[in-house]
């Protein structure tokens, strides 16, 4: 019973050691999630800054668009004024041309007939004073009209000059406004380019943050799934442990009952047959003297199938004699470690969920019940199995047991437990493909190919 407890403790250590990497991976995942959360927070800050930049640039763009609209309105107004001025200038030019012709004609007439002569002729040739006054008045009127025409001519020429200056000034203003508009258009284009870059940076930041967040969620989901699977395996292990303990208790009770029956039968036989073999007398007397020895040959023959259910159990009879230990050879001519030792059904002596449990269940399905090997970690089957008569060494072949401490076979270096598995196939390149329990993502029935170097191949006796 002590050996069973020790075996359970050791196997629990193996299971917990196998589960430890899952806890480590989950912890690493949580650490990575915390780091990525910080990255996402930083990305959100960058998003706010980018949005502020977008708002600022958009404000500038709106201002430029307003200026552009105002400038276009001013240009349209200047063009309209220029058209009106051009029309007025054309009219003034026509009026000036007509007056110029009239003044030129009057000037030529004045050269031929001077004003003084006109006045003298008017006085001399007048018939009366009234006629004189009328002619002089007419001459004065003509002179006044010519004077007004000259003044109007000068005025209109001055207006023409002023309007020309105005048109020229407006034209210059139009050119200046056009240049300003072009400059503003270039600035607008530049600002829009900056706005586009800022927007793209913002989108890239958001996309990156979302990708990282999704990666984190996927990684976290995978870690949680692994943790759930580990919890399920632990629960299955505990259930198997409970079943194994119940089966072991039943097996121990049956063994004790069988030993008691065998002891009673041996006592009855001894009382009815006084004469026994010398070897039996010697064995019995040695057992009585030491109170701690191997079972006698007759008792061994009677109870070998019962006592083999647990090589580590100890049973004390009422007289204080002790039947104990693991028989690995011949005692009184009976081979306890020979063929058939694993043929009698027993409860699974190996802790559930591990590599030894997987191999035991593999052979139990074939009606072969491997006895408890102590110490019985996976790598120890290679030496302790044959030494205790439970296993024997064979060559590499499909369906045999593989046991080793090699790093490639175990899966990591310096293992204190080693590993045991079932050979699925033997490959030409010096490797073997194995099926195993307590290993890999599949955990139960996991398959992989490893080097056959340093591996011992076994079969149950």
Curated annotation (Swiss-Prot):
Please state every residue range assigned to the domain named Peptidase C51: 330-459
Q: Where is this region: Disordered?
A: 264-343
Q: Name a single GO biological process.
A: actomyosin structure organization
Tell me where on the tree of life, at the top rank, the source sits: Bacteria
Q: Locate the compositionally biased regions of type Gly residues.
A: 330-340
Q: Which InterPro entries match?
A: CHAP_dom, Papain-like_cys_pep_sf, Rho-assoc_Ser/Thr_Kinase
Q: Name one GO cellular component term.
A: cytoskeleton
Spell out the Low complexity composition-biased ranges.
Answer: 264-329
Q: Name which cysteines form disulfide bonds.
A: none
UniProt keyword annotations, A-Z = Signal
SUPFAM superfamilies in the record, alphabetically?
A: Cysteine proteinases
UniProt GO MF annotations: protein serine/threonine kinase activity
Annotated signal sequence is: 1-27
This chain's protein is named Secreted 45 kDa protein
Q: Which organism is it from?
A: Lactococcus lactis subsp. cremoris (strain MG1363)
Its lineage reads:
Bacteria, Bacillati, Bacillota, Bacilli, Lactobacillales
The gene it comes from is usp45
């Amino acid at each position: 019973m002590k050996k069973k407890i020790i075996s359970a403790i050791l196997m629990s250590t193996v299971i917990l050691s196998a589960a430890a990497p899952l806890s480590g991976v989950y912890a690493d995942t949580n650490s990575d999630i915390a780091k990525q959360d910080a990255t996402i927070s930083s990305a959100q800050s960058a998003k706010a800054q980018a949005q502020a930049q977008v708002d600022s640039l958009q404000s500038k763009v709106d201002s430029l668009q307003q200026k552009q609209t105002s400038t276009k309105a001013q240009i349209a107004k200047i063009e309209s004024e220029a058209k009106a001025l051009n029309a007025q200038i054309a009219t003034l030019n026509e009026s000036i041309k007509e007056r110029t012709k009239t003044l030129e004609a009057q000037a030529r007439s004045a050269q031929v007939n001077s004003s003084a002569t006109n006045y003298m002729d008017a006085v001399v040739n007048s018939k009366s004073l009234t006629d004189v006054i009328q002619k002089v008045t007419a001459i004065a009127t003509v002179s006044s009209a010519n004077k007004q025409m000259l003044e109007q001519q000068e005025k209109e020429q001055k207006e023409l000059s002023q309007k020309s200056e105005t048109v020229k000034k407006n034209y210059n203003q139009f050119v200046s406004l056009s240049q300003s508009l072009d400059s503003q258009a270039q600035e607008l284009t530049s600002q829009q380019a900056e706005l586009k870059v800022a927007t793209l940076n913002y989108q890239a930041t958001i996309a990156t943050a979302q990708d990282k967040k999704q990666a984190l969620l996927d990684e976290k989901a995978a870690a949680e799934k692994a943790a759930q699977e580990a919890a399920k395996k632990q629960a299955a292990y505990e259930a198997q442990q409970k079943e194994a303990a119940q089966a072991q208790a039943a097996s121990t009770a049956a063994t004790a009952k069988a030993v008691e029956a065998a002891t009673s039968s041996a006592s009855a036989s001894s009382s009815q047959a006084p004469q026994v073999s010398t070897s039996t007398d010697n064995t019995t007397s040695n057992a009585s003297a030491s109170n701690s020895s191997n079972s006698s040959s007759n008792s061994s023959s009677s109870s070998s199938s019962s006592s083999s259910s647990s090589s580590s159990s100890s049973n004390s009879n009422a007289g204080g004699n002790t039947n104990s230990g693991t028989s690995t050879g011949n005692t009184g001519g009976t081979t306890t470690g020979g063929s058939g030792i694993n043929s009698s059904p027993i409860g699974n002596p190996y802790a559930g969920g591990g590599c030894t449990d997987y191999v035991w269940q593999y052979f139990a399905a074939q009606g072969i019940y491997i006895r408890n090997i102590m110490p019985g970690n996976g790598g120890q089957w290679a030496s302790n199995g044959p030494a205790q008569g439970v296993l024997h060494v064979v060559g590499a072949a499909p369906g045999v047991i593989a046991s080793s401490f090699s790093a490639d076979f175990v899966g990591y270096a310096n293992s204190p437990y080693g590993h045991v598995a079932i050979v699925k196939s033997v490959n030409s390149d010096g490797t073997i493909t194995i099926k195993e329990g307590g290993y890999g993502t599949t955990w139960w029935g996991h398959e992989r190919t490893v080097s056959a170097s340093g591996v011992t191949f076994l079969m149950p006796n």
